[in-house]
UniProtKB/Swiss-Prot annotation:
InterPro entries: Mdm12, SMP_LBD. Residues 321-340 have a biased composition (Acidic residues). The keyword Transport applies. Residues 89-106 have a biased composition (Polar residues). The gene is MDM12. GO terms for molecular function: lipid binding. Component of the ERMES/MDM complex, which serves as a molecular tether to connect the endoplasmic reticulum (ER) and mitochondria. Components of this complex are involved in the control of mitochondrial shape and protein biogenesis, and function in nonvesicular lipid trafficking between the ER and mitochondria. MDM12 is required for the interaction of the ER-resident membrane protein MMM1 and the outer mitochondrial membrane-resident beta-barrel protein MDM10. Residues 1-321 form the SMP-LTD domain. The lineage of its organism: Eukaryota, Fungi, Dikarya, Ascomycota, Saccharomycotina. The keyword Acyltransferase does not apply. One of its GO terms (biological process) is protein insertion into mitochondrial outer membrane. Signal peptide: none annotated. This is Mitochondrial distribution and morphology protein 12. The SMP-LTD domain is a barrel-like domain that can bind various types of glycerophospholipids in its interior and mediate their transfer between two adjacent bilayers. It is found in: Mitochondrion outer membrane; Endoplasmic reticulum membrane.
């Protein structure tokens, strides 16, 4: 089932500047990178989402993975739901403070129960918008009916073959694993995302020549990334007014999973065009253009960053809670304490 996105309404929303949010997120992550000695101060200066939306095709709908509930319980214990977790916290649970990265073991077969077989009872009756996301992210209709007896093949085998085992391994871990509440609004969507749009990203940095000698020369460097190509299988879960997003694997031109293991199964960005410029072009016209080694370094770092941030078993979480409602809840709790 394909989804029609109101791309213009999404990127021009009054609620949030999506392009600036993404630019700021990427820029903060680049500030934390270990750069080569001859490159310093990399920053993301501009980001335009363009006018061409990604193509989204729903493959399957199921209950959310239990790992997402582990984070929900951890967040509930701390009485704080941040809009976006940093990488080291994203996979944290009360009993598992670090990311499990067992790349040799396949997914526990028990996880397959989270993929409902075709022909079962409707999984999302009365769905109005995909994932119940805000109205600015969709134009309110899809190309099929709102009830979803799926007729497309389930990609369960792909997920089982690439998803690293994060199921509890000991009786103690199983006892500590949170039991998901029976919330009928919770759901998870497995979908293909294909993008060949006109997003543009501007990057600036400083190149150090003759480093570390005393005669070091500093040259400004500008890069413009465009023609980004993505074709991946991803999951998006909606749990208690929070959205979780993780990329499972890359797909080839026939929409088959790329046969790789571990995080190497993912590039996320299949192809990208880079226009680079090094030097002070505006002063003496002596700028160097399209320096291949620097270009490749930037692309490799962006791919590594994306894999660390959103490739399973990592994910990003975006809270859809209204700040006003949070303030009201806090005031109500304060009033109750005053009464006692």
């Amino acid at each position: 089932m394909s989804i029609d996105l109101d791309w213009d309404g999404m990127i021009n929303s009054d609620e949030i500047d999506v392009a600036e949010w993404l630019r700021s997120l990427l820029d903060k992550q680049f500030q934390q990178l270990d750069l080569p000695r001859n490159i310093r101060s990399v920053s993301i200066t501009t980001l335009s989402l363009g006018t061409i939306p990604p193509e989204l095709e729903i493959k399957h709908i199921s209950d959310p993975f239990p790992e997402f509930y582990a984070e929900e319980e951890a967040a509930a214990d701390s009485h704080y739901l941040p809009p976006l977790h940093p990488p080291q916290q994203r996979r944290s649970a009360p009993s598992t403070p670090h990311i499990h990265t067992n790349t040799t073991n396949p997914i526990d077969r028990g996880i397959a129960s989270y993929f409902h077989p075709l022909g079962s009872a409707p999984l999302m009756s009365g769905l109005r918008t995909p994932l119940n996301i805000p109205s600015w992210a969709t134009n309110g209709h899809t190309r099929t009916s709102s009830r979803l007896p799926l007729n497309t093949p389930i990609e369960a085998e792909i997920v089982e073959s690439v998803r690293e085992s994060t199921a509890p391994r000991t009786p103690e871990e199983r006892e500590q694993q949170p039991v998901p509440e029976d919330r009928e609004d919770d759901l998870q969507v497995l979908f293909r995302v294909k993008y060949t749009g006109d997003i543009r990203i501007g990057v600036e940095a400083t190149l150090r020549l003759n480093y570390p000698s005393d005669d070091v020369v500093l040259l400004p460097m500008k890069l413009h990334l465009s023609h980004i190509n993505i074709n991946s299988l991803a999951i998006m879960a909606y749990i208690k007014k929070s959205i979780y997003l993780s990329v499972i694997c890359d797909l080839d031109d026939s929409d088959h999973a790329v046969a790789r293991t571990g995080r190497e199964r993912l590039d996320i960005i299949r192809d990208v065009k880079i226009d680079s410029e090094i030097g002070h072009h505006d002063t003496n016209g002596a700028a160097l253009r399209n320096v291949g080694k620097v270009d490749r370094f930037i692309v490799d770092k962006i791919r590594s960053l994306l894999k660390a941030e959103i490739a399973w078993p990592s994910w990003i979480k975006v809270s859809m809670e209204d700040e006003d409602s949070d303030d009201e809840e806090g005031e109500e709790e304060g009033d109750q304490e005053d009464e006692h």
